[in-house]
A protein has these predicted regions:
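Catalytic cores of DNA base-excision repair glycosylases
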Residues: 2-218
Length: 219
């Protein structure tokens, strides 16, 4: 199978499995999505979705958020981990949104990535899921799957993102990155992975990844 055929197989298979694909983080607008994505660093989406209703009940916009102290924010988000850094980021970026952006989340990478605690991946998620602007946020699931499928040799998420953008049509990026995340969680996990359930890796997977799996099964 050529690389182009592999890419088409991935697109078609994921479209069959996930014709409708949910956004993992609960939110109602760009601001609440931005905060949820910030909280998701080194934390599960399930945990974030348990904590954000508690935070957003007190403040679901930057104007209300800056009425809270950093300490109050930190106590609410503590179960998400890294709460000192995240609470500082939430408080400071809320101030900047008010001071520089009329309280609105900017719909461009430059302004987003200038916000405290907002890196390229967070900005990409907001651009894609809040504003429907083509982006391809790469998380650990996408990084792992692109390697297993032989579509990227990237040792960093930055390189994997470049490969994904080069291989997949731009008009499919926003949906496809979500489809790959869900597929990684349900069929191609880092641990407890069962090749028989993983039609994509079984069909187009990197030989080294498949051989490693088979070797581990014999132990």
């Amino acid at each position: 199978m050529t690389k182009a055929e592999k890419v088409n197989f991935v697109i078609d298979t994921l479209e069959n499995i996930y014709p409708e694909v949910p956004i993992p983080l609960d939110h109602k607008d760009p601001y609440t999505l931005l905060i949820a994505v910030l909280l998701s660093a080194q934390c599960t989406d399930v945990r974030v979705n348990q904590i954000t209703p508690l935070l957003f009940a007190k403040a679901d916009n930057p104007y209300d958020m800056i009425k809270l102290t950093q300490e109050e924010i930190k106590e609410i988000i503590r179960p998400c981990g890294l709460s000192p850094m995240k609470s500082k980021g939430i408080y400071e970026l809320s101030h900047i949104l008010i001071d520089k952006h009329q309280g609105e989340v900017p719909a461009n990478f430059v302004d987003l990535e200038e916000l405290p605690a907002v890196g390229h991946k967070t900005a990409s998620v907001v651009m894609s899921q809040a504003f429907n602007i083509p982006a391809f946020p790469v998380d650990t699931h996408i990084h792992r799957l692109m390697y297993r499928w032989g579509l990227s040799n990237g040792t960093t998420v930055q390189q994997t993102e470049k490969d994904a953008k080069r291989l997949f049509p731009e008009e499919k990026w926003n949906k496809l990155h979500l489809q790959i995340i869900w597929y990684g969680r349900e069929y191609c996990q880092a641990r407890g992975w069962k090749l028989d359930n993983d039609i994509i890796t079984k069909t187009i997977g990197r030989k080294a990844a498949i051989n490693e799996y088979l070797k581990n099964q014999k132990k």
